[in-house]
Swiss-Prot record:
UniProt-listed Enzyme Commission number(s): 1.1.1.25
Keywords (A to Z) from UniProt: Amino-acid biosynthesis, Aromatic amino acid biosynthesis, NADP, Oxidoreductase
Record-level Gene Ontology MF annotations: NADP binding; shikimate 3-dehydrogenase (NADP+) activity
Protein name: Shikimate dehydrogenase (NADP(+))
Single Gene Ontology BP annotation: chorismate biosynthetic process
SUPFAM superfamilies: Aminoacid dehydrogenase-like, N-terminal domain (SSF53223), NAD(P)-binding Rossmann-fold domains (SSF51735)
Classification via Gene3D superfamilies: Leucine Dehydrogenase, chain A, domain 1, NAD(P)-binding Rossmann-like Domain
Length: 284
């Protein structure tokens, strides 16, 4: 990697963030595309967020990525938001356009790009969970022309989830169906008519648990996706594959959301296939 007076910085900003795989991905991409850039991880306190955003202009950076807890907190300090960032209410990428700071959310785009030969337009989706990742997948699906979405959360989370779905409907005219995860017969019925089933919860990170009961029967053509990539094969994905369904883990989402950010910063395509090889070697 070349570092000189012309090197431009990009960074991921969060707390905690030292474990992040983003520097690995982006520095590989800078190198592979002969871009004079360097990508670092900044673990900051909330009180330093304003100054951190100011540094994007001050040091003429490409921009920054954001992770928890700053995806929403950063919004007041930006000049403009993209459509999907406005819908989601969260930003994971800030682009420095000649001193203008524009907030994007590439998570949803990254998720749909990682699905093998699948487009969401005109399709039906069942989504488990309603946290940050789920919101980005939801909003992107609506922007991309999904025909129906069923969101399942635990009954204790229904009240907390509804206002966001109401806001989405207000902004897009699209009504998302909200259901309780405990109603297994409803879950089975919705999955039976879906084209895509997504686990956007953290259930399965322990390598033991699954967000759905194992007696659920999956339709043959259903594509199953999990946003988790550690473990590489969650119990949820193992269960889907045991029924003969194609199943995708969350590593592709991580890579393709990074590729979207990289393109916004540099105007260049990230060599995703090459980086995918390195990532799978690292995590498989």
């Amino acid at each position: 990697m070349k570092l000189d007076g012309y090197t431009r910085l990009a960074a991921v900003v969060a707390n905690p963030i030292k474990h992040s795989i983003s520097p690995f991905i982006h520095n590989r991409a800078f190198e592979a595309t002969a871009t004079n850039g360097a990508y670092v991880a900044w673990e900051i306190e909330a009180s330093d967020l304003v100054e951190t955003v100011a540094n994007i202009r001050r040091y003429q950076m490409f921009g920054i990525n954001l992770s928890m807890p700053y995806k929403e907190q950063v919004i007041p300090y930006l000049d403009k938001l993209s459509d999907e960032a406005r819908l989601i209410g969260a930003v994971n990428t800030v682009v420095n356009e000649n001193g203008n700071l524009i907030g994007y959310n590439t998570d949803g785009k990254g998720f749909f790009k990682c699905l093998p030969s699948f487009t969401i337009s005109g399709k039906k989706m069942t989504l488990l969970g309603a946290g940050g990742a789920a919101k980005s997948i939801l909003a992107q699906a609506i922007l991309d022309g999904v025909s129906q979405i069923s969101v399942f959360v635990r009954s204790v989370s229904m009240e907390k989830t509804r206002p966001y779905l109401d806001k989405l409907q207000e902004q897009t005219g699209f009504k998302v169906d909200l259901c309780a995860l405990e109603y297994v017969s409803e879950l089975q019925a919705r999955i039976a008519e879906s084209d895509l089933l997504v686990n956007a919860t953290s259930v399965g990170m322990d390598g033991q648990s699954s967000p759905v009961p194992e007696n659920i029967v999956l339709p043959e053509t259903l594509l199953v996706a999990d946003i988790i990539y550690q473990p590489f094969e969650t119990p949820f994905l193992k269960w889907a594959r045991s029924q003969g369904n194609p199943a995708v883990n969350g590593l592709g989402m991580l890579l393709y959301q990074a590729a979207e950010a990289f393109q916004l910063w540099t105007g260049k395509e990230m060599p995703t296939e090459e980086i995918w090889q390195s990532l799978t070697e690292k995590y498989q």
